[in-house]
């Protein structure tokens, strides 16, 4: 009999340790939110006494065979000179080749089309159940990274996504907006389990707001430089803010060369070189200290199909909240699933630099308001949005699949 564990109740299995393959076309570990998500799901599965094998791409630095959180890790070598699609197709082929020779898996859990399409098609051949974890779909997101993609290619990708979704035994996603989008593609809403992202209270916890005397307040953005993040609107708001109150904007995150160049050009054009600092990403364990130095944290998500139609669950918002920082964020459904306006943060009209500036000034000029919002945000994030809770929800999905074997 397996011991009682985090996800599955005592006495559930008869001496058999379920074998799980977890695949993700994301480098792990890395500063990205996807890596944080994967590591916490991995920890929950291992703590439930599953035999877990994580399959990810390599980055040329991390070892090809490894162990994380007690799970075996295989990193598929990549030719980093190849384009994204070539690397994605190569990864999918490597995953399927592994399944063909590996000891049988009970559940195969995939986070993307890359590998997921082949694995969904092959489930009857190899006898496993499948979980499709939908955090983002290439048919929606790729055009923001690669604006020159042919429409026919995106159509083909969407067809493969639809096939993968309908072939999967279970689907999980991080927001109700995403669930509704999947339902619009013909899936039964009841078959999709929403598991929001979370925070770890041991890493993110409230600290006193910095003193504002004799110093320039810091507004912090942490995240990718992807076009859907709304950073152009954030930059446009800075001149409006500094007309009335000094501020320094610090942007910390990963971006492609094109994205960094566009951001730098906008900063120069507006003459904001002394007011805006752009820094490369930091390891995730350094994020709490960065947030602790900030006076305001911001998530300026843009009004676009990635955020409004497909949906997401921005980890940055939850981490800002848990760390007890005044939050500014776009007023859209994926944010309102996490944040109550004027209770846990101030929400501004998306794509509106004037409204963003107005809300930022309200926080800069009213310390009592900032403290009230920060305290409420921390309490909400640490009580309702933890990785422990996400792991429990994931466990129920696994339990249901294994019951039906």
Each language-model region and where it sits:
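A short, well-ordered alpha-helix in the C-terminal region of glycosyltransferases
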Residues: 355, 362, 369-384, 393-396
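Nucleotide-activated donor-binding/catalytic signature segment of Leloir-type glycosyltransferases, i.e.
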Residues: 261-289, 296
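Carbohydrate-associated surface elements
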Residues: 177, 198
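Glycosyltransferase donor-sugar binding loop
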Residues: 60, 248-264
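Membrane-proximal helix-turn-helix segments that form the acceptor-binding/catalytic region
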Residues: 96-102, 117, 121-125, 132, ...
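Conserved donor-binding/catalytic core segment of Leloir-type glycosyltransferases
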Residues: 21, 212-238, 250
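Conserved acidic donor-binding segment of nucleotide-sugar-dependent glycosyltransferases
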Residues: 317, 341-342, 346-353, 362-368
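Short hydrophobic beta-strand element within catalytic cores of glycosyltransferases
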Residues: 297-299, 319-322, 326-329
């Amino acid at each position: 009999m397996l011991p009682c564990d985090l996800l599955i109740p005592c006495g559930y299995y008869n001496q058999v340790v379920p074998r799980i393959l977890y695949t993700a076309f994301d480098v792990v570990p890395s500063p990205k939110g996807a890596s944080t998500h994967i590591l916490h799901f991995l920890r929950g599965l291992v703590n439930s006494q599953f035999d877990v094998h994580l399959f990810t791409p390599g980055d040329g630095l991390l070892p090809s065979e490894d162990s994380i959180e007690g799970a075996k890790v295989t990193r598929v070598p990549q030719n980093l000179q190849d384009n994204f699609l070539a690397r994605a197709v190569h990864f999918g082929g490597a995953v399927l080749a592994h399944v063909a020779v590996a000891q049988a898996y009970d559940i195969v859990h995939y986070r993307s089309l890359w590998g997921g399409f082949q694995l969904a098609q092959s489930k009857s051949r190899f006898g496993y159940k499948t979980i499709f974890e939908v955090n983002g779909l290439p048919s929606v997101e790729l055009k923001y990274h690669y604006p020159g993609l042919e429409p026919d290619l995106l159509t083909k990708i969407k067809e493969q996504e639809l096939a993968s979704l309908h072939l999967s035994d279970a689907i999980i996603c991080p927001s109700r907006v995403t669930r509704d989008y999947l339902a619009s593609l013909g899936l039964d809403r009841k078959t999709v389990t929403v598991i929001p992202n979370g925070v770890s209270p041991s890493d993110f916890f409230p600290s006193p707001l910095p003193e504002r005397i004799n110093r320039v307040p810091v507004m912090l953005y942490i995240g990718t430089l992807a076009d859907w993040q709304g950073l152009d609107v954030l930059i446009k708001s800075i001149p409006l803010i500094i007309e009335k109150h000094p501020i320094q904007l610090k942007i910390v995150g990963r971006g492609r060369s094109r994205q960094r160049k566009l951001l730098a050009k906008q900063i120069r054009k507006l003459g904001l070189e002394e007011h805006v600092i752009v820094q490369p990403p930091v390891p995730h364990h350094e994020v709490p200290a960065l947030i602790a130095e900030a006076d305001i944290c911001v998530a300026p998500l843009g009004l676009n199909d990635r955020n409004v139609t497909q949906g997401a669950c921005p980890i940055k918002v939850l981490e800002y909240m848990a760390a007890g920082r005044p939050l500014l964020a776009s007023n859209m459904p994926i944010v309102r699933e996490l944040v109550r306006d004027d209770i846990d943060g101030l929400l501004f009209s998306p794509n509106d630099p004037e409204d963003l500036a107005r809300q930022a000034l309200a926080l800069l000029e009213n310390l009592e308001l900032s403290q009230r919002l920060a305290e409420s945000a921390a309490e909400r994030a640490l009580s309702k949005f933890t990785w422990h809770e996400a792991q429990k929800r994931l466990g129920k999905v696994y339990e249901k699949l294994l019951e039906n074997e």
